[in-house]
C-alpha cells in the first residue's frame, strides 16, 4: 500500500509555499479524469435507458461517450506531457522516467506503472467504443452500455479520491511526489532544485519490446470486451443466434492481436535472461494465455453456431469467460497477490478491492441477463 505524509506533516506542508511546481498540468489531468468518469457514467445511464424504453433515442448516450473518449485522450496527453517535460514534482514522472531516456523509452514509461497501464487500456476501449457507435447498428445501445460500464470502473481506478479519510478510490497518476512520500526534502520550499533527475525506467524494461508489447497486449485485452458485450446484449434481447455475425470479426481480431502480444512477450522474455526463456510458466504469463485459449475455442464454437445453430451454451460460455478471465488476470497481476511469485506482477496500490469488484460485476452481468425478471426490466 502506498504511504503518504502523516497528518502533522501534511499540515506543515500545507503552510509552505513551494517554488517551481507546475500545478496547472496536474489539476488539468485530474479534471480530465473526473470528466471521463462522469461522462462514461452518464453515457451508460442513457444507453441503458434507450435499451429499456423502446423508441427512446440514444443520442445522449453517444454524446457522453464521445465526451468520455475525448477526456481519456486528454488524460493521456496530459500525463505524457508531465513525463516528457520532466515534471518531477509528480510522483509518476519521478518514479518512472529520467532525463537521459530516449524518446521511445520515455513513451514506455507511460505504461510501466499501474496507473499508466490502466489508462492505456482505457484508451483502447474508448477507441473501440467510438468505432462501435458507427458500426454496431441495432446492437449499439446494449453493447455501448456495457462498454461504458467497463470504462466507469477503469476510470475509477485513476480517481485517487479520498472518501471521509476512510477509503481511497483509485490511484491518481497526477499525485504530487510530496503528497505520496515522507521525506525531509519536502520541508524546503525550493525542494525541486534538489530533484536533479527521476529514478528512470527499470533497465530490464529499456528494450524495444517494451515499446510495442504492452500496447499490443492491452489492445488484445480491450478487444475481448466487444464479443462479450454482443453476447450479453443478445441474452438481454433473447436473440441467441443473431449476435454471432457482428461479434465474430471482433473475436477474430482479438484472437490475432492477443496472440501477437503473447508471442511478443515470449521473444522479449527470451532476450531478457532473467525472465527465463520464451515461456517460464510464470503465473502472469499463464494469466494472459488462458483468455487467449478460451477465445480461440470460442471462435470455433461461434463458427459452429453460425453454420449449424448448435453449441449455443458452449459458445456463450467461452466468449463470456474470455473477458472475465482477462479481468481476473488483471486482478492477479495488479493486486499484489503474486508479488512474491512473478517477475511480471505489479506492487499493490491498494486497488485489490476495486479489481475484485470489477471481476464480480462482470460475472454478475451475464447472470442477470439470463434471468427472466431482468430481461423484462430492460426490454419491456
Name these PLM-found stretches.
Residues 1-12:
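Short, Lys/Arg-enriched N-terminal segments with co-localized hydrophobic residues
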Residues 14-380:
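Polytopic transmembrane helical bundles with strong interfacial aromatic enrichment
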